[in-house]
Swiss-Prot record:
InterPro entries, per database record: Elong-fact-P_C, NA-bd_OB-fold, Rib_uL2_dom2, Transl_elong_fac_P/YeiP, Transl_elong_KOW-like, Transl_elong_P/YeiP_cen, Transl_elong_P/YeiP_CS, Transl_elongation_fac_P
Molecular function terms, GO-annotated: translation elongation factor activity
Described function: Involved in peptide bond synthesis. Stimulates efficient translation and peptide-bond synthesis on native or reconstituted 70S ribosomes in vitro. Probably functions indirectly by altering the affinity of the ribosome for aminoacyl-tRNA, thus increasing their reactivity as acceptors for peptidyl transferase.
Main subcellular location: cytoplasm
Pathway membership, UniProt: Protein biosynthesis; polypeptide chain elongation
Similarity field: Belongs to the elongation factor P family.
Subcellular location(s) per record: Cytoplasm
Protein name: Elongation factor P
HAMAP family (alphabetical): EF_P (MF_00141)
Keyword Protein biosynthesis in annotation: yes
Listed GO biological process terms: peptide biosynthetic process
Length: 186
């Protein structure tokens, strides 16, 4: 059980038979009446977002999520197949379960798969990944690091804004949380 006063961004709770993750929260203490916590919750299974208000100090069941490190091995008929490298057990996730993470997911990558009651829910990518640029405007002599940016398409199909001096075939480091360019990778 967790108190509504202890909510933080990313806290997972069980509500109405499903797992919800706190996206935003605000402790409100009005001049008259009792304090409450206004939250924005996201359903982990479906991705729907709702706003819900709880009394301050209200006890709610905390969702016990299990994280396991698995390797993305291949895709089969729209499903993403992951393997536990110690037990060689396979886990399948649909494109909906993976969500936006699929734009950075490539074969051989190790990720954390979050499960609840033995059912895989979602994939957590590393904070940064190294990917190759497959398509972008060519770099022109004189372009500098302090100049502007241009769109580049990466090997997984993701589009990221990169500095003007980068060209096709170069490997770059990308922040998976906000789709930003972090730097060149050798």
């Amino acid at each position: 059980m967790i108190s509504s006063n202890d909510f933080r961004t990313g806290t997972s709770i069980e509500l109405d038979g499903s797992v919800w993750r706190v996206v935003e929260f605000l402790h409100v203490k009005p001049g008259k009446g009792s304090a409450f916590v206004r939250t924005k919750l996201k359903a982990v299974q479906s991705g729907s977002v709702v706003e819900k208000t709880f009394r301050a100090g209200e006890m709610l069941p905390q969702a016990l999520l299990e994280k396991s490190t698995l390797q993305h091995t291949y895709m089969e008929s729209g499903d993403y197949v992951f393997m536990d490298m110690s037990s060689y057990e396979e886990t399948r996730l649909t494109a909906q379960q993976i969500g936006d993470s699929r734009k950075y997911l490539k074969e051989g990558m190790e990720v954390n798969v979050v499960s609840w009651n033995g059912n895989p829910l979602e994939v957590e990518l590393p904070n940064s990944v190294v990917l190759e640029i497959t398509e972008t405007d060519p770099g022109v002599k004189g372009d500098t690091a302090t100049g502007g940016t241009k769109p580049a398409i990466l090997e997984t199909g993701a589009q990221v804004m990169v500095p003007l001096f980068l060209s096709v075939g170069e490997k770059i480091k990308v922040d998976t949380r906000n789709d930003s360019y972090l730097g060149r990778e050798n």
